[in-house]
């Protein structure tokens, strides 16, 4: 316990407790020093609890009882679970005080300037730096702009404020991916400009990077949520699921473009936009016509959606630069009038488009009704044609009715016979097919059950992976927190001596364990030997008793020998019982000696003497108070 006491004393001194240099153990603490140490620790742990407590023990007994009760209540409020009261401080025992001080030392923050339980990590450190910077800026006095020096003008003006304006960036992906062409990798390595060179304004760099990172993170989160909710239920691999989804999006885009092109063509509004839509649809058809069966339509559509030819992009930019008018301050009014007229034309065109759209919807409804009527008429005509065909055949058979009836009867009989044969064949095939169907149904059900089980296992595995990832993140944060706490620990205390002493204690414990194991094994061997000897003695006495008892009826000396044998056996039993009782008494003596040592460490006698002295002091104080009351 000496090392533990030294660590506790060092912790108490770091809290502000004035522990004398000659005190090296908790056993040497008196009541005044205990009260001061506890109050100092409470003030560091929770200033609101220790602010109302005095670290100096008052001389009066009633005040001492009050401060002892207050300290006990404060320790219980902190979560101390063991028994604590005013007697713990006024009539202290070494184990109780050591346990209480260890509890308070564990509650102490690692650094008095910061809370030890603050989160660690890059984000937490960044937040702390931001808070410190804001506090520093808020602590600066405010001055009018004309009275500020150059540094304050830069730090307290709005010249550093910029709008959050993000722009698209072209960044290189992972070059280790095999799906990236070598030409693109070469472009990334040699010709791709840096991020700061891609943007016209330098303040947009941070906004663009933050926006790109946020979009990537949100895309990953949306994909995980979609894969959890829909992807796993589709029983497809992630690549197949993405391919199916992109094919559906391609079809929807193509359908929307076709509808827009058809609407522009019906409204007779030729323009550059309609021409672009037509070219786009033609490109879709060309891409999907020849290579659709080869499975490359998706790649071509993806290239169309996410990539552009550099030459085409350059031509479009040149054409846009030629078409866009160069604004001038003198032509602002003319441009405003032109914009107003164009807006009116756009409104009128939109109104015409809405009217044409309504008429188109009406025509579509009319076409649907007419198509339904035409289908009904076609169906009625087919039914009447069938009736006419049957009647015509019957009229042709009327001239030779008897022969035709005989032939018809023959055909009916043959058909009946053939039907019977077919029924027999069908029954035989039906039984076989029914068995096959039941077998296939059973196999399908087993496969579905197996698939469901695999699906459930996949979901459980995915959840376990997510839980493991969260646990890894939490442990990483905990590791960073512990690392920051370790770095913030005071470096003046050398841990080498404590570590060496801990290793010595561990080696001593191992030696004691070996000795205890050896004693236990020796005890077991001794007990086993005692049991063997006891059994041998009992068996020997039984055999001897039987042999002597047979001859004791006939011979007087043998009868005396039998009596001596019985007395010897009884005396041996009493001797063994006496030895066992002696061992029990010795064990009880050792237990009592240990209890005496424990009570001696609790300083029971000194505490009782102190209690008697306090009792006399209280009686004296009461007598003085009564005397003052009578005098008053």
Swiss-Prot record:
GO terms for biological process: positive regulation of ubiquitin-dependent protein catabolic process; protein transport. The keyword Ribonucleoprotein does not apply. Keywords: Coiled coil, Cytoplasm, Cytoskeleton, Endosome, Protein transport, Transport, Ubl conjugation pathway. Residues 243-269, 326-367, 400-540, 584-628 form a coiled coil. It comes from the Eukaryota. Belongs to the CCDC22 family. This is Coiled-coil domain-containing protein 22. It comes from Xenopus laevis (African clawed frog). The lineage of its organism: Eukaryota, Metazoa, Chordata, Craniata, Vertebrata. The gene is ccdc22.
């Amino acid at each position: 316990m000496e090392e533990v006491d030294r660590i506790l004393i060092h912790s108490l001194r770091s809290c502000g407790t004035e522990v004398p240099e000659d005190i090296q153990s908790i056993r040497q603490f008196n009541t005044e020093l205990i009260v001061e140490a506890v109050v100092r620790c409470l003030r560091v742990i929770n200033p609101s609890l220790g602010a109302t407590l005095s670290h100096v023990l008052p001389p009066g007994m009633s005040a001492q009882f009050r401060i002892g009760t207050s300290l006990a209540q404060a320790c219980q409020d902190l979560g101390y679970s063991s028994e604590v009261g005013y007697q713990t401080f006024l009539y202290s025992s070494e184990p109780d005080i050591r346990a209480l001080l260890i509890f308070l030392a564990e509650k102490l923050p690692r650094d008095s300037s910061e809370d030890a339980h603050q989160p660690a990590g890059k984000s937490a450190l960044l937040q702390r730096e931001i808070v410190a910077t804001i506090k520093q800026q808020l602590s600066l006095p405010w001055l009018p702009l004309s009275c500020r020096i150059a540094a304050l003008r830069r730090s307290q003006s709005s010249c550093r404020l910029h709008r959050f304006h993000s722009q698209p960036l072209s960044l290189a992906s992972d070059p280790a991916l095999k799906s990236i062409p070598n030409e693109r990798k070469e472009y990334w390595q040699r010709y791709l400009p840096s991020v700061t060179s891609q943007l016209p304004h330098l303040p947009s760099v941070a906004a663009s990077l933050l926006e790109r990172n946020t979009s990537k993170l949100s895309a990953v989160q949306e994909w995980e949520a979609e894969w959890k909710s829909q992807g796993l239920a589709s029983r497809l691999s992630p690549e197949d699921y993405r391919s199916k989804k992109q094919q559906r999006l391609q079809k929807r885009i193509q359908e929307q473009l076709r509808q827009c092109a058809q609407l522009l063509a019906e409204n007779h509004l030729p323009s550059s936009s309609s021409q672009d839509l037509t070219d786009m649809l033609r490109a879709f058809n060309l891409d999907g016509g020849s290579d659709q069966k080869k499975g490359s339509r998706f790649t071509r559509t993806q290239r169309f959606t996410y990539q552009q030819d550099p030459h085409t992009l350059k031509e479009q930019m040149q054409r846009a630069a030629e078409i866009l008018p160069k604004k001038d301050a003198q032509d602002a009014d003319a441009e405003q009038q032109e914009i107003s007229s164009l807006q009116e034309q756009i409104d009128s065109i939109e109104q015409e488009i809405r009217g044409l759209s309504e008429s188109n919807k009406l025509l579509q409804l009319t076409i649907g009704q007419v198509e339904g009527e035409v289908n009904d008429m076609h169906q009625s005509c087919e039914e009447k044609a069938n009736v006419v065909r049957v009647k015509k055949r019957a009229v042709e058979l009327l001239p030779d009715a008897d022969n035709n009836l005989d032939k018809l009867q023959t055909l009916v009989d043959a058909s009946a016979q053939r039907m019977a044969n077919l029924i027999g064949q069908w029954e035989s095939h039906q039984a076989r097919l029914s068995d096959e169907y039941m077998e296939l149904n059973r196999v399908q059900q087993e496969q579905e059950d197996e698939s469901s089980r695999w699906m459930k296992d996949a979901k459980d595995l995915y959840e376990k992976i997510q839980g493991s990832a969260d646990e890894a993140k939490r442990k990483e944060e905990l590791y960073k927190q512990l690392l920051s706490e370790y770095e913030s620990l005071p470096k003046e205390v050398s841990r080498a001596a404590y570590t060496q002493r801990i290793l010595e204690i561990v080696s001593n414990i191992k030696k004691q364990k070996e000795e205890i194991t050896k004693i236990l094994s020796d005890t077991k061997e001794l007990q086993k030997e005692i049991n063997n000897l006891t059994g041998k003695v009992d068996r020997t006495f039984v055999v001897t008793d039987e042999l002597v008892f047979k001859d004791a009826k006939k011979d007087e000396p043998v009868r005396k020998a039998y009596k001596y044998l019985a007395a010897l056996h009884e005396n041996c039993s009493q001797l063994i019982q006496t030895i066992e009782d002696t061992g029990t008494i010795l064990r009880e003596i050792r237990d009592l000696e240990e209890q005496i040592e424990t009570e001696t460490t609790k300083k029971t006698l000194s505490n009782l003497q102190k209690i008697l002295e306090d009792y006399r002091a209280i009686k004296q104080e009461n007598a003085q108070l009564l005397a003052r009351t009578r005098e008053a």
